[in-house]
A protein has these predicted regions:
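Glycine-centric low-complexity repeats
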Residues: 1-415
Length: 415
């Protein structure tokens, strides 16, 4: 195993962890060392070492990035990459270190380190999780934080691609000033000849609990591409903020060259405590030869001022089969509420058409508008896809339900 990196003082960068040793025989690769801690005022954590390669065993896991806490700036170290394996499974990527700042009156910036990528092998290694970013909560100041991105899953030769790592959590709890927090993006799923890896979930963003602040959830990672079955897209992260919140977008499903596309990830929910909440859009389904992946559902939006649901993801197209169905729009809740529109059905030339997504419902203390449904896909000799239903609307003064969509045509079958 690799040794740990050294620590740094004051304005400093921690040393990187050493790489794990390679194994030429039956054994597994060595584990990468952890990174060293950064300085007290400005802290940059050291990166984790890479895992060692293996021949018939499992690649070594990547070392973890170091946590970094500085007075004004903290940047977590990135996780080490997992080791590859020629005839075994790839090693897992190391987790990114957290980054934080603790200045009582200045500008606090905390950035989480990225997770390490998984190693390649017969089955791909999982990507490491991104590190958290945050601050201690300053007064009369500005808090900015970013969660680290999740590492990508490793590629697979004969099996399943590695799952993408989860994006890091971000928090900016400014008391009187302004805080903004952005969750880290999920890692990509690993590519494979069999089944592609699942994309990582986006990180949560939470900002300004007691002051003006916004929180934005991280986007979900894309599913891995594959020959047989594309990977599922990762879900978008939750966004929470006193002033406003926005959910992260769902990751797209992985494409498949000869099988079924992966489904799109669900959009992240959003909460604006006194402002607006906007749900994340659903991920697009993966394209394929036989069957397209379904689109992901849009996230819900909730806010005292207004809530807007995210749009559903479109279904993936299919070159010789049936396209994927569209995802449903997210619901909206608030003083004014609006439901998200449903996603379109994927194009295809199969016997039956894919269904269009339903519109999201809306609830508003003053007014509400339901989301529109999406049109159903056309068919050849079977049944056309159902048109999506319009979303319901409930408002004290004004309410408008969403429009329903047209059903799909059929050339020699039933519309």
């Amino acid at each position: 195993s690799g040794g740990a990196g050294g620590n740094a003082l004051m304005f400093g960068i921690g040393g990187n962890g050493g790489a794990g040793g390679a194994a030429s025989g039956v054994g597994n690769g060595g584990v990468g060392g952890a990174g060293g801690a950064g300085g007290a005022l400005v802290a940059i954590g050291g990166a984790g070492g890479a895992g060692g390669a293996a021949t018939t065993g499992t690649g070594g896991a990547g070392g973890a990035g170091s946590n970094a806490l500085g007075l004004f700036l903290g940047l977590g170290g990135s996780g080490g990459q997992g080791g590859d394996s020629a005839m075994g499974s790839g090693g897992a990527g190391g987790a990114g270190g957290s980054g934080g700042a603790a200045s009582p009156f200045g500008i606090d910036i905390g950035i989480g380190g990225a997770g390490g990528h998984g190693g390649a092998g017969t089955n791909g290694g999982a990507g490491g999780a991104g590190g958290a970013g945050g601050s201690s909560g300053t007064v009369f100041a500005l808090d900015l934080s970013w969660g680290g991105a999740g590492g990508n899953g490793g590629a697979a030769t004969t099996g399943t691609g590695g799952a993408g790592g989860t994006g890091g959590f971000a928090v900016a709890p400014d008391f009187i000033g302004f805080g903004a927090a952005y969750g880290g993006a999920g890692g990509l799923g690993g590519a494979a000849t069999g089944a592609g890896g699942t994309g990582g979930t986006g990180g949560v963003g939470a900002g300004g609990f007691a002051a003006l602040g916004v929180g934005v959830g991280g986007a979900g990672g894309a599913g891995g591409a594959a020959t047989e079955t594309g990977g599922i897209g990762g879900a978008g992260g939750l966004g929470v903020g006193l002033l406003g919140g926005a959910g992260g977008a769902g990751g797209p499903g992985g494409a498949a060259s000869a099988g079924s596309g992966g489904h799109g990830g669900t959009g992240g929910d959003a909460l604006g405590l006194i402002g607006a909440g906007i749900g994340g859009v659903g991920g697009v389904g993966g394209a394929a030869t036989d069957t397209g992946g379904n689109g992901g559902a849009g996230g819900s939006g909730t806010g005292l001022l207004g809530g807007v649901g995210g749009a559903g993801g479109h279904g993936g197209g299919a070159s010789v089969g049936t396209g994927g169905s569209g995802g449903a729009g997210g619901d909206g809740f608030g003083f004014v509420g609006a439901g998200g529109n449903g996603g379109n059905a994927g194009t295809g030339v199969g016997v039956n058409g894919a269904n269009g997504g339903n519109g999201g419902s809306a609830t508003g203390a003053l007014a509400a508008v339901g989301g529109a449904g999406a049109a159903g896909g056309d068919a050849t000799s079977g049944t056309g896809g159902f048109g999506g239903a319009g979303g319901s609307a409930r408002g004290l003064i004004f309410a408008l339900g969403g429009a329903g969509a047209a059903g799909g045509d059929a050339s020699t079958g039933v519309g």
